[in-house]
Amino acid sequence: MSSDQEMAIFGEAAPYLRKSEKERIEAQNKPFDAKTSVFVAEPKESFVKGTVQSREGGKVTVKTEAGATLTVKEDQVFPMNPPKFDKIEDMAMMTHLHEPAVLYNLKERYAAWMIYTYSGLFCVTVNPYKWLPVYNAEVVTAYRGKKRQEAPPHIFSISDNAYQFMLTDRENQSILITGESGAGKTVNTKRVIQYFATIAVTGEKKKEEPTPGKMQGTLEDQIISANPLLEAFGNAKTVRNDNSSRFGKFIRIHFGTTGKLASADIETYLLEKSRVTFQLKAERSYHIFYQIMSNKKPELIEMLLITTNPYDYAFVSQGEITVPSIDDQEELMATDSAIEILGFTSDERVSIYKLTGAVMHYGNLKFKQKQREEQAEPDGTEVADKAAYLQGLNSADLLKALCYPRVKVGNEFVTKGQTVQQVYNAVGALAKAVYDKMFLWMVTRINQQLDTKQPRQYFIGVLDIAGFEIFDFNSLEQLCINFTNEKLQQFFNHHMFVLEQEEYKKEGIEWEFIDFGMDLAACIELIEKPMGIFSILEEECMFPKATDTSFKNKLYEQHLGKSNNFQKPKPAKGKAEAHFSLIHYAGTVDYNITGWLDKNKDPLNETVVGLYQKSSVKTLAFLFAERQSSEEGGTKKGGKKKGSSFQTVSALFRENLNKLMTNLRSTHPHFVRCIIPNETKTPGAMEHELVLHQLRCNGVLEGIRICRKGFPSRILYADFKQRYKVLNASAIPEGQFIDSKKASEKLLGSIDIDHTQYKFGHTKVFFKAGLLGTLEEMRDEKLAQLITRTQAMCRGFLMRVEFRKMMERRESIFCIQYNIRAFMNVKHWPWMKLYFKIKPLLKSAETEKEMANMKEEFEKTKEDLAKSEAKRKELEEKMVALMQEKNDLQLQVQAEADGLADAEERCDQLIKTKIQLEAKIKEVTERAEDEEEINAELTAKKRKLEDECSELKKDIDDLELTLAKVEKEKHATENKVKNLTEEMAGLDENIAKLTKEKKALQEAHQQTLDDLQAEEDKVNTLTKAKTKLEQQVDDLEGSLEQEKKLRMDLERAKRKLEGDLKLAQESTMDIENDKQQLDEKLKKKEFEMSNLQSKIEDEQALAMQLQKKIKELQARTEELEEEIEAERASRAKAEKQRSDLSRELEEISERLEEAGGATSAQIEMNKKREAEFQKMRRDLEEATLQHEATAAALRKKHADSVAELGEQIDNLQRVKQKLEKEKSELKMEIDDLASNMETVSKAKGNLEKMCRTLEDQLSEVKTKEEEHQRLINELSAQKARLQTESGEFSRQLDEKEALVSQLSRGKQAFTQQIEELKRQLEEETKAKSALAHAVQSSRHDCDLLREQYEEEQEAKAELQRAMSKANSEVAQWRTKYETDAIQRTEELEEAKKKLAQRLQDAEEHVEAVNAKCASLEKTKQRLQNEVEDLMLDVERSNAACAALDKKQRNFDKILAEWKHKYEETQAELEASQKESRSLSTELFKVKNAYEESLDQLETLKRENKNLQQEISDLTEQIAEGGKHIHELEKVKKQIEQEKSELQAALEEAEASLEHEEGKILRIQLELNQVKSEIDRKIAEKDEEIDQMKRNHIRVVESMQSTLDAEIRSRNDALRIKKKMEGDLNEMEIQLNHANRQATEAIRNLRNTQGVLKDTQLHLDDAIRGQDDLKEQLAMVERRANLMQAEIEELRASLEQTERSRRVAEQELLDASERVQLLHTQNTSLINTKKKLETDISQIQGEMEDIVQEARNAEEKAKKAITDAAMMAEELKKEQDTSAHLERMKKNMEQTVKDLQHRLDEAEQLALKGGKKQIQKLEARVRELENEVENEQKRNVEAVKGLRKHERRVKELTYQTEEDRKNVLRLQDLVDKLQSKVKAYKRQAEEAEEQSNVNLSKFRKLQHELEEAEERADIAESQVNKLRVKSREVHTKVISEE
């Protein structure tokens, strides 16, 4: 758990991601009782927290936090997790895992706005319904490169893990973001894309030329900008989501080999086209329509000829028009900006807006029906003109094509007339097609823009698809969306539960298969299997006369009662009609099939499509360019069938879905589950039951369980050994081949981890959750230790090199000082002055010759430099040519790779085509069989129909006879149905009425009127029955003819299908042959791959052996270093003795110098013997020069050999330098003492004794030198042994290279080689530039030395020799560099030839490999990656061996040179000893002078010591200052180090005192001042030695003051740094205090917000309740008003009827005066009518009693209806019949009105026309009276039938009550048994967990014991080794002493 400081990198997002330290501490200290703290089931909240009060008899009494007391069963109580698990980030870590624990953890995190939570292997996110600051740039940076356990849960963490897995595992990844609609999938998708665009940013603009209208955005900008554009055209507001994606998309983000963005592409699925023309009330259309009308860009309003009011356009105003959470104006600007960034041209942009506006105008097109025709015609042309203008069409042509489309009939085209409804349907279809095609075209354009043509290796796919939807009205779009989610959930279940456990079984891991019950195959097969829903739908679309009803009937026949997931929906009042129900994983959905056939066929007006193809708007013409109209099809293809190109929407959808699932299966998936917290979109509120339902459906708990029980992490053995062997390399034995599995077992066994947390499979090692992260942390720590140790060794080596250089400079300074002192002593001698004058004259000729030679050399040097420049230019040109060749080869390799990829794609396409053809063949075969069966059935039916036709002709007369009987039965049935309908209407009205009395009166009145109306309607119904039956007979004859025609069509279709079948079979045979060839190739490739695998294993074994030998060599090197350390100690003693001797000799020399100037007699004697001394001095000087040259060579060789032999040779060189220095000092002292030999003979005797002692010491040194020689011989023997081993290694390496060369000729290996050669060329160029710089510096230095020589040739003869020496060294350097340059150019030429040969081989090999690897790309990539890793190891081992070989050769060369120089030095040392013995007699003479000058020597010695101490202190301080400045200037270190080394070499040649240039600039300036002071003192010939000393002291003091100032400034800087660090700490403390205060304030604010939220929730509940009451009251009032209005209408109609009756009676009375008979008949009719009214009133009373009884039995009837399926079916049928009768009733009412009208006319005619009309009316009245009597009889029969049904309902009710009681008893028994089973399971699981814990503890203790024993053994062995080494060291020390 991270601290608050570590969380500070997340900025303001930290509180929303992880609990603070204070909260964690409070949670840990919170009181908690694990036995009583529980969750308890509760009806309202599902689960609540509580405390156990008591447990008795399987019942638990719990007191909830709200204070309520509940008594529940044991299985309804769940233990609570300790407080430290509150708001836990990974729910798989919980102690108690159950539904309430998961629910409350999500709820508490959601309340704290921590919306992301891990759930085992996947992530759960809850929609916050508000903006949170958790997606800022600093959050993206904080999550980059973090492991999952290192950072809080977040979508960025999932994304980064996928990114890292892609890079390390070399496998494509996918992120599946799923959830219901409105759960937040789209937002998370955008965040994933934002993360990848940020971390894998390329930062490079597109390389194509900028074109007008294009913004040059980077690839990441374009990827991010694709979302706003797609959301504007593809997202809309739905009931559950304000920004719902109405299409699915799969975004693939491609990455290059380095992990940078390469390109991207988008695949879309099933845009919801119907939303363009239709929306529900609470929804709206796509955002782009409302963005355009937001008036943010007024120029769009003018261009599109629209207004800003959405209600002006029918297509977009059927639902809501505004969304509170969306600002359409801002979204329009974002959409417009995205169009520009994505590179759409200005014409394309304008056409997009124009087509969108045209769709809006389509909704306003009006059509009307022509008079006296069904033909439609335009109702105005203004809207059509606007739409046609925007689409680049002629409005007249458009209207003509809509109203009079051309249709192909046979081989001719005819003009077809359209009804108004057909025209509206065609307009809607065209609008949807234009919008859909435009959307798909935009996606294609986006993909073209995102395809950068850069090389890409892997991709990460992000899936965002419409969530699961359950609406009131669910159509074909909802079925497709829900089916997609069903498939994705099945993919998740299969991946998480099935594949996981199957892999355990396959790998041989002990595992008991767990069935989680999450298989969704039944529902998926129901939809997509043959004869499933989609199959039936597509089959129906093939038949021209299929309807929605026939489709529904087929669904019922195939699936109703046969599949548990297919059900018949139950009717619900207030909801849309549903035809079938499916049980999905997320719930039961009712589907309405209305219009599915048209949606699936997606028909278009071909005439209008032809106009589109000729449009002046290029985009519109392009959209429909590929669609051929019926006219073009007829002209181009003749009579060819169009079924071959016919593809339904469902088929296209299934094809895309199968592609998606194939893509997902080929990737490594990462799941993100989005959860809806509530249905009201309220931030912070969580509905328990809703969340639990989603958790159960998504398999969250099951995923956590399998994560805890299973082994989610697994690695191949070879990969594990390669990656983690660094944890304990000693566990894997070196030098012998060991299997990767055994190596992994040993490695894991040697690591301190819980061994129950992993299992070994056949090919992989499996880990429990979290263990792999622990191993990664251990590996990181180990690598950090190794790197730290390596850095320490490198720093130590560099500092030792620096120290050696400092010591060399110190010794050079001492030498120069000594020479200057000696020169200052002799320069005032007269003879010396004479010598100075004569010497140049003698050597002037030689000097001129030397100058001439130098000029010649200079000219040669210039020529050589010109030649080297020319060669350099040639090499640069060659390098350019090589680079060009390299680029050409890379292009060729890329082209070959593209060709390979194309071949693979073609192969994949062929395989897919084969699979599709096989499926089509199967479908065609099945369809042919079905057609044959149908044909046989039709043939039989034809025969039957022919027979039946003859029988029908005979039976027509019988039917006419039985017609009356049928009519009676029909009327009886209708009466029964009508009575049941009236009963249901009464029941419905009973629910709605306000008071019983008012409702009863209204029903009675209305029922009376309805009965009267119905009685009149039935009269007309009976008259039309006969005509209907006759029409049915005619229809049967017509259907017979149609069946004949259909049979003919089927026979033609059968012949065509047989032809297609033959073609398909032939293509199948070809495909089978191709398949066999591919199988043979595949077998060959597998054999080749097995051979390659064996070779790779051999290579691994050789690599292991080489690594073992390298380690042995390293151990031997360590032993040599230990011996060198011992030798170093002995050398320190010798050095101490040499320092003592040098000090004594210096004292002697100083005394002798003082004694030399004591007396004039001694000076005279010196003059006499000056000649002898000069000769001796020349000899000594020559010897000294030889020794100095030898010392310089030894120092150089010593510096070269230090890298291999370490401190041993360094000490030896230091001894040699001390001896040479002593020799030179002794010779100089002998020179000075020779002039005083006669006067100090006594002192010589004493000095002779001292020389004897020195000889003894030299003999000791000689013995030590012999020991060194012996050591060198041993090293030579060791070198020979190493040489033989190196030869063996080289032979093995040659064999290895021969084997590896076959594998290393791939594209990537050659690319690495070319880059290596390029780097070598750059290094050569740098070396040449350094050489040129060195030559130029040497020329400059030669000029300087020449000037010094001309100026001071009288006083500096010795410096002249030094200059000549420097020139010779420069020449050596030059010749060396020239030879090296020539050699390197030859090597470069050779390398170029090798490279050309290798490139040629590579081309051949690449061609061969490309030809071989078409179908094995994925396997090839994996093996190639493994080979690359092996190649890296081989190259490293080759490089190491080559370096060892090179070092060995250098070592041999150095040893030989060292041996030769040592022999020469030994000879010179012997000569010096002889010379020293010859001069020892003379040394006795100076003994007295030595004694006399002892006091002066002591004083000089003290001064010398002080000066030396000061110089050493200054040197150390300078070194410290150099280190400090070196640390400050790390960037310049390498360049200036090379420069300083060359400069130091040249400065040593010219005897300067400068330090390295560029390292210490300030100290270099001071040393230059010192040099100028020394030069000036040399030029001043008359200055005394004392003045020189004072000058030195002044220089030292100035250096000291400068150094003190430097130290003070450094101390000030350190003090300021400490002060700043203190201030920073104080600021951090203040910041922590401020953060704590802020967190407290935020917590108080959250508490206040929580209280406010609770208050707001209560207030919202109260307001909702009040609103519900108001709605109910308003509904009741509306119903009352409607009823009152109906009553008023009925009263008005009654009054009108009464008036008309009175008028008719008056007219009849008038007519009766003229015709008495008619009057009497009318009177009898009125009496009969009154009698009928009394009878009807009696019947009405009886009906009221029946209705009252039905009301009393209402509740029982409802239960009976729900429980009895057959009764429900009866009621459904009766309801359908009732609806049909209701329509008939309305028709009859219209008929009654017509009859009434006719009656009035008849009466008028009767008044006018005479007796015939009256007689007809009298006959009609008699018929009516007969019909009324018949109707009365039917009513009586209906009453009897109703009573029978009531008895049946009562019986069913009693039976249902008994069944319900039995079910309850059985349910109680089942619950008890289940509770017992759960208790037993829980006890077993607890016991198992306890045993596992004990077993793990035992294994851990056993492992620790074994490790302790191993450590004890190792420590004991180390102690023994140390003892042996200490004894050896002790014996060596004793022997040396």
From Swiss-Prot:
Keyword Nucleotidyltransferase carried by entry: no
Phosphotyrosine sites (modified residues): Y389, Y424, Y1462, Y1490
Cleavable signal peptide: none
A Pfam family it matches: Myosin_head
Any GO CC annotation of this UniProt entry: myosin II complex
CDD domains tied to this protein: MYSc_class_II (cd01377)
Domain Myosin motor intervals: 86-780
Region entry Disordered, spans: 1116-1164
Keyword list, A-Z: Actin-binding, ATP-binding, Calmodulin-binding, Coiled coil, Cytoplasm, Methylation, Motor protein, Muscle protein, Myosin, Nucleotide-binding, Phosphoprotein, Thick filament
GO biological-process terms attached to the record: muscle contraction
Modified residues annotated as Phosphothreonine in this record: T64, T69, T419, T774, T1239, T1253, T1263, T1284, T1465, T1499, T1515, T1728, T1734
Residues carrying Phosphoserine: 1090, 1094, 1160, 1235, 1241, 1259, 1276, 1286, 1290, 1301, 1304, 1472, 1493, 1512, 1540, 1552, 1572, 1598, 1601, 1712, 1724, 1737
Coiled coil ranges: 841-1937
Localisation: Cytoplasm, Myofibril
Residues covered by the IQ domain: 783-812
Extent of Basic and acidic residues compositional bias: 1126-1154
Modified residues (Pros-methylhistidine): H755
Gene Ontology molecular function terms on file: actin filament binding; ATP binding; calmodulin binding; double-stranded RNA binding; microfilament motor activity
Residues the record lists as binding ATP: G179, E180, S181, G182, A183, G184, K185, T186
Residue stretches making up the Myosin N-terminal SH3-like domain: 33-82
Modified residues (N6,N6,N6-trimethyllysine): K130
UniProt-annotated stretches for the region Actin-binding: 657-679, 759-773
Entry's free-text remark on domains: The rodlike tail sequence is highly repetitive, showing cycles of a 28-residue repeat pattern composed of 4 heptapeptides, characteristic for alpha-helical coiled coils.
Subunit structure: Muscle myosin is a hexameric protein that consists of 2 heavy chain subunits (MHC), 2 alkali light chain subunits (MLC) and 2 regulatory light chain subunits (MLC-2).
Name of the protein described by the UniProt record: Myosin-4
UniProt lineage: Eukaryota, Metazoa, Chordata, Craniata, Vertebrata
